[in-house]
Amino acid sequence: MHDRLSRRAARLIGRAAPLLSPGRQAVLSLSATLLSAAALAQPAARAYAIPAGSLESVLTRYALESQLMLSYSAADVAGRRSGGLTGSHDAASALRQILAGTGMRASLQPNGGYLLRVAAGADDAQTLPSVTVTGDGAETAWGPVAGFVAKRSATATKTDTPLHETPQSVSVVPRAQVVAQAADSLDQALAYTAGVMPLDGGALRNISTGFTVRGFNITGSAPLYLNGTKLPMNSMSGAMEPYNYERIEVLKGPASILYGQAAPGGIINLVSKRPTAEPLREMEVKYGTWNTRQLAMDFGGPLTEDGNVGYRLTGLARDADTMVRHINNDRQSLSGSLEWQLSGATRLTLLGGWSRTDNPYDVGKPREGTLLPNPNGAISRKVFLGEPGFDRFVVQGGHLGYLLEHKINDDWQVRQNLLGYNHRANSNNLYMMTSSVDAANPARVERLAVSRDDTDKGIALDNQLLGKLRHGRFEHTLLFGVDASRSSLTRDQAVGLNAVPIDVYDPVYGSTPTLDPARRSISRARQVGFYAQDQIKFDGRWIGLFGGRYDRARTEEAPDDGRQDSHAFSPRAGLMYLFDNGLAPYYSFTKSFQPTSGMDFGGTPFKPTTGTQHEIGLKYEPPGVDAAITLALYDITQRNVVTSDLANPGFSVQTGEVRSRGAELEGRASLNHNLDVVAAFTLTNARTTKSTRGDEGARPASVPRSMASLWLDYKLAALPGLSTAAGVRYVGRQESDGVTVPSYTVLDAALRYRLQNWEFALNVKNLTNKRYIAACPYACYYGDERNVMLTARVNW
């Protein structure tokens, strides 16, 4: 047997210990020790900042951070307090400080873990009720991750499921990686993730979030999810701050089985920070390139003596410029949660957030002078082609919701999740008329003025019944759900065609465009879905994942009086096998649907596009090593794609088809407790396979054929508290309307030092100050120049 089985046994013992007699608990504890076949390497010295608190909470947090196995009696630790742990320690030194004054001692065990017991009663330790705590065992699908390697997720199943037992590819970016890489936007947080590419190369991170996943633009009807619930339908409703989230997860491939309408490439799910059992106090200050100044805070802990009510409050304020003149990156955000354990069986968590962004919009650069030659030379990375006195983008809004959980008995529970949101966005922008310069004057571009006032609001409700059944050698985790959502986008838009052209090499500002009267449009969407899922385990080795969902959706467009009613059934099937050596091959089949607005020449509303994916893969978790590797091969076909109606110019037909086939390899590891590794490699062959435009074989924009990345984060044992890191990101060539965006390679680096409860960091992105085009979906966007960020963080 290997370490995975010992961890399972440990978790079962931890849950069952209070229900068993002391003698049976002792036997179970001894059995768990015997199940560990691979001795765990002792952690090297590393820095900790664990505040004082109950001994149980300090031990739990230490196990989470060190990934060390600790076994102790629940009765022994009850009522005892610890002074916490600060400074740099190896395992023995850390436990001496944690246990100082508690009357307990730690003994090294043959399996590499430690047995904790009362010093005076050591001879009777074999009769004590035993609880085993490990870093792996402490993780849940909605909680923090110890280090860089997540072991559980709910994004693919809506249940707390090990990633190693999920027959579909899921990438999890934990909080530790976001901090180590100083990622202040979603595109930066996902830069080392296989198969994910920002639409604009990250150039618009100050106002919006858009990505392609597995070759498909996922920004349309379902841009982002928060705790499994869809966020606003408008992709311009503002950027998201990684600081507010515990983990960022990407489910690859169709996700309609659980989430309804969505693009076939996948979804991005943000998991909120939740209340903590012990007091949490963190302040963070950043200063860097482009006059970046940022202050952030993170507070949490219990509000009552019995710990039944807890809170979490996270806030951020940033005042910053960007690489492009006249464009800033200012933002304020506040997120909070309140958790109330109403009874032993019922828990209510309130979640809310507010944010405000006030930043102009980078309209990009023309192709001539960036991607293509221009007789006047290369266009500066810093030039702004809008009007400083006219261009603006202000978005303000928030969300509020709750998560309600009630346990009916040990096997069944009901859950209800609700999320409501309201965003208001006001923008004025001068866009380029085309993606090219004026043919008569290659230094000039024609411009178009657009003013928008958007109100984006909605509400979503998800009701779930979750249960477990066991019969013979079969174990079932059953999920039944009904969800419904309503959303609306009201837009007042005015356009001005007489904007003054601008010289891209010597811009002269000051003109004010004249706008036509604003026109109002209203988009409304409703959806209700019924879904069922069965996660089956047979003999502890075979994993089956089967389910289906039926959706009814309605979209309405005014003033065009357009209305579309659609329905779809979305099945999923998956199968995998768990080998003792940590290998787990799998196969999955999934489908998606996505409503399409508009009508054909005959007035018939368009059908939803549909996506079908076949995926085979191999997951590997080496026994005794904190690592996870996933290899996935996929084939996705999207049908009912809108293409030109050649018989009726100005209209469209749904005879188009897009196919994406590719391979993804992603690995994460924490080795010897001082080296963290994140590696990814992507091959994507996305093509238009059916079209009336004659563009069969064309690749979609912002979809590189290949991508690769590697991040190494090393804690220096010789210099306790000091860490260094380096990263490399390669993005292969992209195609866009017949032109090619060259490949590029960017280097990143970091240096960190922890001194007791303080941490100081220096992060450098684009270390060599490489000049490159990041993306060219319409206009062209340069990648960021070299930028440096200094961070000071304190926990107390």
Predicted segments — roles?
Residues 129-135, 165, 169-175, 180, ...:
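Periplasmic plug
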Residues 243-246, 257-336, 342-347, 398, ...:
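Outer-membrane beta-barrel translocator/receptor signature
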Residues 318-322, 335-341, 345-407, 422-456, ...:
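Acidic/polar loop-and-plug regions of large Gram-negative outer-membrane beta-barrel proteins
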Residues 341, 456, 475-479, 483-487, ...:
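Structural signature of Gram-negative outer-membrane beta-barrels, strongest in the C-terminal barrel
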Residues 400-422, 447-558:
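Face-selective signature of the C-terminal outer-membrane beta-barrel domain
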Residues 405-409, 413-419, 423-431, 585, ...:
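Membrane-embedded beta-barrel scaffold of Gram-negative outer-membrane proteins
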Residues 478, 701-796:
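Conserved C-terminal beta-signal and adjacent last beta-strands/turns
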Residues 635, 654-737, 791-795:
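Gram-negative outer-membrane beta-barrel transporters
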